[in-house]
Amino acid sequence: MPTIQQLIRSQRIKCETKTKSPALKACPQRRGICTRVYTTTPKKPNSALRKVARVRLTTGIEVTAYIPGIGHNLQEHSVVLVRGGRVKDLPGVRYHIVRGSLDTAGVKDRLQSRSKYGVKRPKS
């Protein structure tokens, strides 16, 4: 606990919070172009082929982004929208691609949690 005299001499230092998605430069989403679309395997207890893409953002930074949902239409030079959000079992993947925007199509035949996968309401 500092004395009043010590506080007069120098103010308290503000704690700066470190961002978890620095490549977005304090924006909610960023546009980018896919440079490579491939699959990776997750960390130890899990086993799968996770779909990821290397994306060059408009900020000029190249990041690895996860492609959520079953099936996708992405290939090299596709224009995508990237949001923050890491994938726990893929080291180095700290971004998600937004489904149903720009060149990314929504997930086919999806009926639940549609808004997260860019799917319009089905005709009843």
From Swiss-Prot:
Any one GO MF annotation of this record: rRNA binding
GO CC terms of this entry: chloroplast; small ribosomal subunit
TM region(s), chain numbering: none
Keywords for this protein: Chloroplast, Plastid, Ribonucleoprotein, Ribosomal protein, RNA-binding, rRNA-binding
Compartments where located: Plastid, Chloroplast
Protein's GO biological process: translation
InterPro entries to which the protein is assigned, alphabetical: NA-bd_OB-fold, Ribosomal_uS12, Ribosomal_uS12_bac
Predominant location category: plastid
Subunit annotation: Part of the 30S ribosomal subunit.
Record function comment: With S4 and S5 plays an important role in translational accuracy. Located at the interface of the 30S and 50S subunits.
Family: Belongs to the universal ribosomal protein uS12 family.
Protein name: Small ribosomal subunit protein uS12c
Source species: Ostreococcus tauri
